[in-house]
Design a protein with these regions (language model features):
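Acyl-CoA thioester-binding alpha/beta core of soluble enzymes
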Residues: 1-42, 109-111, 196-375
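Short glycine-/small-residue-rich Rossmann-like dinucleotide-binding loops
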Residues: 17, 63, 86-88, 114-115, ...
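Active-site-adjacent "lid/gating" segments in soluble enzymes
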Residues: 27, 31, 92-237, 241
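Glycine-rich phosphate-binding loop and adjoining beta1-alpha1-beta2 segment
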Residues: 30-60
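Short gly/pro/ser/thr-enriched loop/turn and capping motifs at secondary-structure boundaries
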Residues: 43-45, 116-120, 139-141, 266, ...
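Redox-cofactor-proximal catalytic regions of oxidoreductases
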Residues: 50-74, 132-140, 317-329
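A structured beta-alpha segment of the ubiquitous adenosine-cofactor-binding alpha/beta core
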Residues: 52-104
């Protein structure tokens, strides 16, 4: 781990899950936390490929085995954070819920990362990003006029409203513990996390420029100066020239600067102006439009593919005194195998009891010696 990272010395147990919780662990690991993924010996769909495992290690725990549970509890005693991605009550039914674990380790920050609101009508339901956005209200505003809501890829719910919000809660709890010495339970879910991120559009709903059905408002595709346009080569450019000075530069770049045109904010002319812009943008390739607008304030940007964006990738935030670890490593499908790094973790976390533990050569399951009866 880095010698001067902001989370150096913070020990995190990340119960193995899908995208949101591994992402939360990834952010913490990138900033120096010692993140250990707790893997199950088997999964219903075979071993998952966790590509969000940068700077992490793995320990395999069978939570239904008393000896393996004892090993898990030994790690909990020295951990700072535990990330629980399961549905409400799952860990408590195993006797490993926050009630027990925070009593075992009063400094522990037990972070729930649920899908739906735990006390809401869908609290025990299965779901994915699209379901959470649907219930949060966000999906209702994403899409074109007279079309169904459009799935916006699984970024907003899973990673922003889920994983990143969970990290925020963990950091708040770490700050509180710094002044009080006490851990606490952090409860996050992707519905409320996403809804919180949508505070501004929710507050603006029904007000000027945001008072019409989906696809007929300023920021959802109705305005000709806030739209995505196709270019001659089948690529796209994004236009976001709202302010008058930027709009003037947009018109200049399109060759319309000296033409007599309708007033920018006259909605009655927006459809005609959009049609006009569409024809002009199709007259040049994306790169030709880049030559026109790059370096100007016309607010016209190329829609780039993954292999075209600026490299190297940067960390979430850049800190002058306590930088993150390298986030460009393991970019191409990294993998931390089950149990990888287990012996090193035990040596660093619990050296005084390491001799009392053993790892099964085949399953990689960690247990305390002398107990192996299934619950």
């Amino acid at each position: 781990m880095g010698t001067n990272t902001p989370l150096k010395g913070i020990k995190v147990l990340e119960l193995g899950g899908l995208a949101p919780s591994p992402f939360a662990g990834l952010v913490l690991a990138d900033y120096g936390a010692d993140v250990v993924r707790i893997d199950r010996p088997t999964t219903p769909f075979g071993p998952p490929r966790d590509t969000l495992c940068r700077h992490k290690r793995s320990i395999v725990i069978d939570l239904k085995s008393p000896s393996s549970r004892d090993a898990f509890l030994t790690l909990v005693k020295v951990a700072d954070v535990l990330i629980d991605p399961y549905r409400p009550g799952v860990m408590s039914r195993l006797g490993l819920g926050p009630e027990r674990l925070t009593k075992l380790n009063p400094r522990l920050i037990y972070a729930h990362l649920h899908g739906f609101r735990p006390d809401g009508m869908y609290g025990q339901a299965a779901g994915h990003d699209l379901n959470y956005l649907a219930v949060s209200g966000i999906l209702s505003i994403v899409g074109r006029k007279n079309e169904k809501p459009s799935p916006p890829a699984n970024i907003l719910g899973d990673f922003a409203g889920g994983g990143l919000v969970c990290v925020t809660g963990i950091l708040f709890a770490l700050l509180h513990r710094h002044s009080t010495g006490r851990g606490q339970v952090v409860t996050t879910n992707m519905v409320d996390g996403s809804a919180y991120l949508a505070t501004f559009p929710r507050q603006q709903h029904g007000h000027q420029n945001m008072d019409r059905p989906r696809g007929e408002n300023l920021l959802d595709g109705a305005a000709p100066f806030y739209e995505v346009y196709e270019t001659k080569d089948g690529r796209f450019v994004a236009v976001g020239a709202q302010e008058p000075q930027f709009y003037a530069q947009l018109l200049h770049g399109l060759g319309l600067g000296k033409r007599k045109l309708p007033e920018q904010w006259d909605r009655t002319h927006w459809p005609a102006m959009k049609s006009r812009f569409e024809g002009i943008f199709k007259s040049k390739t994306m790169n030709e439009w880049r030559a026109v607008f790059d370096g100007t304030d016309g607010c016209v940007s190329p829609v780039l593919q993954w292999d075209e964006v600026e490299k190297p990738y940067k960390p979430l935030v850049e800190l002058s005194e306590s930088p993150s670890l390298d986030v460009s490593v393991q970019e191409d499908f990294p993998e931390v195998k089950k149990g990888e790094g287990c012996s090193e973790v035990l040596k660093e976390w619990v050296p005084e009891v390491q001799a009392k533990m053993r790892v099964d050569e085949q399953t990689k399951v960690l247990t305390m010696k002398g107990r192996d009866v299934k619950l």
